Amino acid sequence: MICPGMDDFAAALPRVGALAGLDLGTKTIGVAVSDTLRGIATPLRTIRREKFSLDLADLMKTVAERQIAGFVLGLPVNMDGSEGPRAQSTRAFARNLEKLTPLPITFWDERLSTVAAERAMLEADLSRKRRAELVDHVAAGFILQGALDRLAHLGRAHG
């Protein structure tokens, strides 16, 4: 089920359960997961994209292993707030994912998540090669953490 807003997503989730954050690129999918209480996002891995069915099988293996309760997809919105082809591609991925899982799916504005990930890795003094290996799932971690912080805020406001 695709949830248009974070309020809808929060309502569709069970009280506890890990979430998966995805940073969808043309060649890779960065994957991050939260703890079951949804406080901390941890970058997990990068899936090298092949075709949708193989990518999804790989992703669903992680979903089963980690007992994922919902998905947060990074939505690549332009700096002016408009949506371009990459955002449309992300929405199409969500529609295809929705056909294959009952888990709730929402979007999180991913503007500057890759920049933040790069900056954090530069500060950690990682080599260029290592940064290239990690950037996608580290960016997924930034995306998921933003959504987790919003969910925590909503929980405090409603509760």
Curated annotation (Swiss-Prot):
Its EC number is 3.1.-.-. Its main location: cytoplasm. GO terms for cellular component: cytosol. GO terms for molecular function: nuclease activity. Gene3D superfamilies: YqgF/RNase H-like domain (3.30.420.140). GO terms for biological process: rRNA 5'-end processing. It holds the Pfam family RuvX. InterPro entries: RNaseH-like_sf (IPR012337), YqgF (IPR005227), YqgF/RNaseH-like_dom (IPR006641), YqgF/RNaseH-like_dom_sf (IPR037027). Keywords: Cytoplasm, Hydrolase, Nuclease, Ribosome biogenesis. It is found in: Cytoplasm. The keyword rRNA processing does not apply. Belongs to the YqgF nuclease family. NCBIfam families: RNAse_H_YqgF. HAMAP family: Nuclease_YqgF. PANTHER family: POLYNUCLEOTIDYL TRANSFERASE, RIBONUCLEASE H-LIKE SUPERFAMILY PROTEIN. Could be a nuclease involved in processing of the 5'-end of pre-16S rRNA. This is Putative pre-16S rRNA nuclease. It comes from Rhodobacter capsulatus (strain ATCC BAA-309 / NBRC 16581 / SB1003).
